[in-house]
């Protein structure tokens, strides 16, 4: 589905099962977009659409709390960790800020605090978030945000950045200090880097953020050292007990500057909301003239004690907010409209544009979402149009400018046949989405289905990337999933740019994937609308592929995360003889699906049946590890303290949760006592 399709649904008239299915689908979609943005640095939707979809999910869950998805983007930050670097757990979770999009919403945030307070104001840098750890004042290691719980250790690359202190400029450093900031590439350096890349026939970067993120993730730090990256610090994370915390956020930033860190020279201390508005007005007008890209402004309660009182949500602090700038818009001309085919056959119109610069990037393509969108906006080939590039990702055509329309402008019509395989295109139930009916007979769908099949959350054949899949399909070496497991060394080495070593790596990766879990297999076969969460639920419920194949509609709709839509899709999938043949061929070549093992919770007198909250950081446990351990012995782990909480497990640097637990008289357990109880 596309963002516009999610927006067009009339959720208030849906049956409960359908509503639940769409909430799950939206949560899965946002998780995937988060992974593409934070982990792969390859977003396919705009920041604006992501923010609107996130808010839509929040609203739906607020109205229907019984349908709240488990482990969704509502509870998490960011994306998962790439392979290739050592994974390090954050000593203190790297959270993100809630967003607002207007001065009215910013005013609401200010008024909710219920204090006439000072706000520290700063630009929101558009780069890569980083945590740098110092021991006794000396650089120890650096970690990316990752999924907020753990990230990639990129110390050697970060040490090459000229303005990163390798030793704190103080005679009395704390024993441990984690400094957080944003790694960026300024506009001029970005243009110079792309010019260099183009001259040397290398792939250029789409924008400064991607250039910064891509540089930090390079394995050769010598190359990174040649790139003029910069670090702008915005705060601290973990700190040892000997660190003397300033009384205000503004003083904290001055302290970091005295330690040798670069901070924004556009920081400002607003004493009231009128000054907040003045700062907003000033920065909005100066944005284009800044040396670096910013995508918004950040406002933080200045008083540190008040920050602690206001507290946190699962996603981040309640005492800070990010104001996001509107998307950048320019004019261009539609030269042509082409139709692309996705994994499920969805037909997406794409405008080919007269190249135009938007935010320092040349744009020549823009999504038109669907044919209904084209009709409602009356967009024609030859029209002058407004193009928006929000958050430096895939542009979209916002509207046409009919006052400039030429007499030969062509109306865009949905083709009756697939542009790739010539199969009939159908529209079911008069929805916005049209689909190619070719299925596995359509090369475009085949290619996208196989890319999905080998992806990390499916069969996880990590050496078989998207480009290689395209090569193999084009060469008629693979058409169905089972064909992947029939590939041989000679076939692979016969392809362009496939040497002996890389070919063997692919074969080893394929062999390694031959014992998938049932949940991975269900996700991999690509049943429409089934994501990770519903795959897990189905695997745990049925316990085997045989039982899943025999599932009846009535049984399916009783399962968590499976509504009528998904249930119908599952039944339809197993009624298709080609799907059955594909799965049987797959099993015939020796794939061994691992059925889930149902583990009975061990009984623990202290924790079984208890509601537990975890706060602070721990010397001997990661937060995720401790959560899983407690759940394995029957505890219910929640994110907030209430009268229903039985105990709070408290580590170092515990904040408002500890305070609230003490106020409510909830039992507090320190790490020193935890091991004995476990």
Swiss-Prot record:
EC identifiers of the protein: 6.5.1.2
Active site: 124 (n6-amp-lysine intermediate)
Pfam families referenced in this protein's UniProt entry, alphabetically: BRCT, DNA_ligase_aden, DNA_ligase_OB, DNA_ligase_ZBD, HHH_2, Nlig-Ia
Reaction(s) this enzyme catalyzes, per UniProt: NAD(+) + (deoxyribonucleotide)n-3'-hydroxyl + 5'-phospho-(deoxyribonucleotide)m = (deoxyribonucleotide)n+m + AMP + beta-nicotinamide D-nucleotide
GO cellular component: a single term: cytosol
Cell inner membrane in keyword set: no
Stored Gene3D superfamilies: 5' to 3' exonuclease, C-terminal subdomain, 6.20.10.30, BRCT domain, DNA ligase/mRNA capping enzyme, Helix hairpin bin, Nucleic acid-binding proteins
Binding site for Zn(2+): 418, 421, 436, 442
Cofactor(s), by name: Mg(2+); Mn(2+)
Location of the BRCT domain: 602-678
Enzyme class: ligase
Superkingdom, taxonomy of origin: Bacteria
Any one biological process term the GO annotation gives: DNA repair
Swiss-Prot/TrEMBL keywords: DNA damage, DNA repair, DNA replication, Ligase, Magnesium, Manganese, Metal-binding, NAD, Zinc
InterPro entries: BRCT_dom, BRCT_dom_sf, DisA/LigA_HHH, DNA_ligase, DNA_ligase_CS, DNAligase_adenylation, DNAligase_N, Hlx-hairpin-Hlx_DNA-bd_motif
GO molecular function, one term: DNA binding
Residues the record lists as binding NAD(+): 47-51, 96-97, 122, 145, 182, 300, 324
Similarity field: Belongs to the NAD-dependent DNA ligase family. LigA subfamily.
Biological function: DNA ligase that catalyzes the formation of phosphodiester linkages between 5'-phosphoryl and 3'-hydroxyl groups in double-stranded DNA using NAD as a coenzyme and as the energy source for the reaction. It is essential for DNA replication and repair of damaged DNA.
Name of the molecule in the record: DNA ligase
